[in-house]
């Protein structure tokens, strides 16, 4: 799952930073992916086991793929919002302090914000489709579309946050505030991807981590 998301992030990043002047963004995207792959091979590693009966459905690859793609695009959007906030703090030509050498090669705040917004535009419908497909699968498997399972709940909260980000981003003078909402959405996404699986018991706790 994590490896698939890493691959999707790599593809999205490659499309976004293919221009020569965007290559300085690569380290900001590669570093978290290296950490994710390390955790995948250590903390989250487990022996392969037969798929539980509830997951033996053609809905599995459809639901997981759509949610994973939406989450991956959203995470890249969040990284660009982080870089945007750094650029707002240290505009082009006014870099200062110990972070100046790191921020100086980055594109302008306007360009970074534009990419974060465009990626979130894709995140919202893809993630929404994944949630809807999961609800359809839940009705077929357990006889109800929604059960407020922890993962379902936080997926819905994440989707609402991305909708709030897009709404705030469309409001004049709210670019910085919108970027912070995008970071909250990214944090909620990461919390849902890792903490929920590791600690909280629920219908999505099939990985054996909790």
Regions inferred by a protein language model and the residue ranges of each:
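Polytopic transmembrane helical bundles with strong interfacial aromatic enrichment
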Residues: 1-210
């Amino acid at each position: 799952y994590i490896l698939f998301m890493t691959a999707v992030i790599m593809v999205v990043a490659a499309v976004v930073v293919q221009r020569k002047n965007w290559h300085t963004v690569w380290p900001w995207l590669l570093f978290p992916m290296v950490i994710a792959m390390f955790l995948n091979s250590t903390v989250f590693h487990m022996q392969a086991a037969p798929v539980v009966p509830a997951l033996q459905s053609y809905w599995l690859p459809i639901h997981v793929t759509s949610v994973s793609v939406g989450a991956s695009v959203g995470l890249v959007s969040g990284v660009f919002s982080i870089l945007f906030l750094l650029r707002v703090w240290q505009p082009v030509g006014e870099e200062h302090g110990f972070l100046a050498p790191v921020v100086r090669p980055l594109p302008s705040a306007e360009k970074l914000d534009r990419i974060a917004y465009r990626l979130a535009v894709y995140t919202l419908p893809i993630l929404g489709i994944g949630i809807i497909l999961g609800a359809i699968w839940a009705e077929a498997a357990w006889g109800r579309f929604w059960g407020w399972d922890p993962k379902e709940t936080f997926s819905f909260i994440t989707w609402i946050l991305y909708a709030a980000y897009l709404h705030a981003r469309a409001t004049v003078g709210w670019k910085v505030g919108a970027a912070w909402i995008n970071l909250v959405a990214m944090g909620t996404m990461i919390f849902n991807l890792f903490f929920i699986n590791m600690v909280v018991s629920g219908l999505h706790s099939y990985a054996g981590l909790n």
